A protein has these predicted regions:
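Active-site-proximal helices and loops of the catalytic beta/alpha 8
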Residues: 116, 120, 193-290, 294-297, ...
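Hydrophobic h-region of N-terminal signal peptides that target proteins for export
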Residues: 11-19
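Sec-dependent signal peptide recognition
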Residues: 2-10
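Short, polar loop/linker segments at the starts of domains and inter-domain junctions
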Residues: 41-60, 310-314, 438-452
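Substrate-binding/active-site clefts of carbohydrate-active enzymes
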Residues: 21-29, 34-202, 217-243, 264-265
Length: 468
């Protein structure tokens, strides 16, 4: 019996070490969801009014029941909301009151354990959102916060008024949320004990780290070492060097510089803006090999949906989404995009998915299904990337020497001509579009692609799977 227990523990440690490895995470694609808004186990739930800023009934049990929906799109990792106890009304779960108790609105201990086991049984990684910067809005009465229940655990109240002042950013309150005093050894040690406890108790595979610049880098370095699994941090900033400075303290970050470039390109209807990222910002992230680990996204819970701006169309969302899947990095897709949600700034972008239905025949659901299937089949994460040609109305790039992606903003058909010579050429052979298998070409010194209002990804014809 002892030998069996030892073997079981050894296997568990192997699984944990594999999931903690950045080289494994770069192979994954992440579906971000807000637990309170994705799925509910309540029968006949009421319509969710997002502007009431309260719980709508989403829970871990409901999420587990909808794993088929997520896996059907090809996602093999989920990012879920923080699970710790929060101030009442904090449906987003970013306002902690007890670091060692669960948010009862999301379910029981058994529910979260069951969800994680169900995910692991399907080879879906679980990424938990965690907050180590602040606690709930309690003013200066910390008696109800566990374990940080004393004024000495916090910085003196002040507001962040200058985001270029790192001392202010690290020591003052974000939105009046009490700011934990990491230089207090007991506070930092307790936070490190807590994250180690969470990782081990729930067998987590990765962490999404909230409010990264608001916490000193020296703490994140310790956090990284103690938690022992992949972390991806929120550095809400468009400056590539500023974002890159958090690589090392944490495993990775979300690619906010690219997010802003994508938004600008589609807002201004000018895809040459993407060249600025490729030629000026991407080389910064290439230093140290971080580009393949960056989270590539076009929306999240903090920003208005892609379709909120009236100039943008569903076809453009299809283009941007396919771009994010085939670009260099880890695709991170925000729940509801597959149903073309168009909510405005927070809280408008936090719709309840059950109010709209879990349709698996929407065009973007199918784009995800096909795109993520081929991303994995072709092992895209090991392929280099090169920008091939661009203009205001189109953009083309390759991955390796056998994957060509083209997007277009043209109102009518446009011919995209690609010079296929030199070191980075597409290798010889017949290529077909993964989204329309009879759309093919034979590689030559010049490749011409006719673009309609749909993204195109060409791969060798012998790699096409008729089931996808």
């Amino acid at each position: 019996m002892k030998d069996i227990l030892k073997l079981s523990l050894f296997c568990s440690l192997i699984i944990l070490s594999i999931s903690a490895d950045a080289s494994e995470w770069k192979k994954r694609s992440i579906y971000q969801l807000m637990t309170d808004r994705f799925a509910t186990s309540i029968e006949n739930p009421p319509t969710c009014d997002v502007f009431k800023n309260n719980y709508c009934g989403g829970d871990h049990k409901g999420l587990e029941q909808k794993l088929d929906y997520i896996q059907g799109m090809g996602f093999d990792a989920i990012w879920i909301s923080p699970i710790v106890k929060n101030a009442e009304g904090s449906y987003h779960s970013y306002h902690t009151t007890d670091f060692y108790a669960l948010n009862e609105h999301f379910g029981t201990e058994e529910d979260i354990q069951s969800l994680i086991k169900a995910c692991h049984d399907r080879d879906i990684y679980v990424m938990l959102d965690v907050v180590a910067n602040h606690v709930a809005l309690v003013g200066n009465d910390f008696s109800g916060i566990n374990p940080f229940n004393s004024p000495e655990h916090y910085h003196e109240p002040c507001a962040i008024t200058d985001w270029a002042n790192y001392v202010m950013v690290e020591n003052c309150r974000l939105a009046d949320l009490p700011d934990l005093k990491h230089e207090n050894n007991w506070v930092s040690d307790e936070l490190l004990r807590w994250i180690k406890y969470m990782v081990e108790k729930y067998h987590l595979d990765g962490l999404r780290v909230d409010t990264v610049p608001e916490v000193p880098k020296w703490f994140w370095t310790k956090f990284n070492r103690v938690c022992g699994i992949f972390q991806i941090g929120e550095v809400f900033n468009g400056d590539e060097r500023y974002v890159h400075s958090y690589h090392g303290p944490l495993t990775s970050t979300f690619n906010y510089p690219l997010y802003f470039h994508i938004g600008d390109a589609f807002r201004d209807r000018d895809l040459t803006i993407l060249n600025d990222y490729y030629s000026r910002q991407k080389p910064v992230f290439d230093d140290g090999g971080y580009s393949p680990l960056l989270g590539v996204f076009i929306g999240n819970h903090d920003n208005a949906r892609f379709l909120y701006e009236g100039q943008r169309t569903k076809e453009q969302l299809d283009m941007a989404s396919v771009f994010s899947i085939f670009w260099e990095g880890i695709p991170v897709i925000y729940y509801g995009d597959e149903q073309y949600f168009s909510g405005g700034p927070d809280p408008g972008c936090r719709e309840a998915l059950w109010d709209y239905g879990y349709k698996t025949d929407s065009p973007l659901y199918i784009y995800y299904k096909k795109g993520l299937y081929y991303r994995k089949k072709l092992e895209l994460w090991d392929k280099d990337i090169e920008q091939l040609t661009f203009a205001k109305e189109y953009y083309a790039f390759r991955r390796g020497n056998d994957v060509l992606t083209v997007i277009s903003l043209a109102e009518n058909n446009v011919q995209v001509t690609i010079n296929n010579e030199g070191k980075g050429k597409i290798k010889d052979g017949k290529y077909c579009n993964i989204f329309k298998h009879d759309d093919c070409f034979d590689s030559a010194e010049t490749i011409t692609v006719s673009m309609e209002k749909a993204p195109k990804v060409y791969i060798p014809s012998d790699k096409i799977d008729n089931d996808y």
